[in-house]
Amino acid sequence: MEEEKNWIVVPTWRIPERLERWHSLIKHLKYNTKDLQMACYVPHHKVGWAWWTCSRVIFPLRDETHLEVQGYWNLAPEKGWLSTYAVRITWYSRNFWTDVTPDYADTLLHSTYFPCFSEGEVRKAIRGEKLLSCCKFPKAHKNQVPSLQYLALTVVSHVRSQGEDPTWKQWRRNNRKGLRMAKQNSRRNKQGSSKSPAEGANFPGLAKVLGILA
């Protein structure tokens, strides 16, 4: 008697491209800029028995929780083989775990990683002084109800980016540079180049980097 196939069903996000772009950006932010120094990158040959997993990236968060992004390959649908890759994004606490959307994962990441406006920037903005910090992960605020302080600082930084101060223009360009840097570094890895990627790139968000929801 032929044994029936057992299926393991988990929610995943299909991605249109391979995961080199994601791996490249994670390694750059972990080893070069140190923005993700606490993150743990596990390549496919260290995953172990889970042969369908091509990588795991674990982000320790506050209060003994962590976020995990698993990349899948060789997935089998009902017919044929899945030609594209997929990722699963899961949040874990001590006694509970749940799958989360890319947007909410960005919010969780920003609670621990990537600097935002400092507490004293609101007072500086009111006094008309030069702001010395900026949010390096603006995508994480996309689905949140922004505070009045965050809105005010965003407006101030936007106005100054249109003026004479080139620093704020650079902050805005950095939001786009993150994804571009990941693409370029991925190509360099394929070509065997040892040239280091550009520094100062902001994190563009999980959905943007992985290409999901495109």
Curated annotation (Swiss-Prot):
Span list, region Disordered: 166-201
Entry keywords, A to Z: Host cell membrane, Host cytoplasm, Host membrane, Host-virus interaction, Membrane, Phosphoprotein, Ubl conjugation, Ubl conjugation pathway, Virion
Induction of the gene: Expressed late during infection in a Rev-dependent manner.
Misc note: Vif-defective viruses show catastrophic failure in reverse transcription due to APOBEC-induced mutations that initiate a DNA base repair pathway and compromise the structural integrity of the ssDNA. In the absence of Vif, the virion is morphologically abnormal.
Keyword match Cell inner membrane: no
Residues bearing the modification Phosphothreonine: 98
Pfam family of the protein (one): Vif
Region described as Multimerization: spans on this chain: 154-166
Positions of transmembrane segments: none
Major localization class: host cell
Short motif BC-box-like motif, span: 147-156
UniProt domain comment: The BC-like-box motif mediates the interaction with elongin BC complex.
Annotated protein name in UniProt: Virion infectivity factor
Job description of the protein: Counteracts the innate antiviral activity of APOBEC3G. Forms a complex with host APOBEC3G thus preventing the entry of this lethally hypermutating enzyme into progeny virions. Functions as an adapter molecule, recruiting APOBEC3G to the ubiquitin-proteasome machinery. Targets APOBEC3G for degradation through the assembly with elongin BC complex, CUL5 and RBX1. Binds viral RNA and affects the stability of viral nucleoprotein core. May play a role in viral morphology.
Modified how: Processed in virion by the viral protease.
Modified residues (Phosphoserine): 147
Compositionally skewed regions (Basic residues) per UniProt: 170-190
GO cellular component: host cell cytoplasm; host cell plasma membrane; membrane; virion component
Topology of this chain in the membrane: Peripheral membrane protein
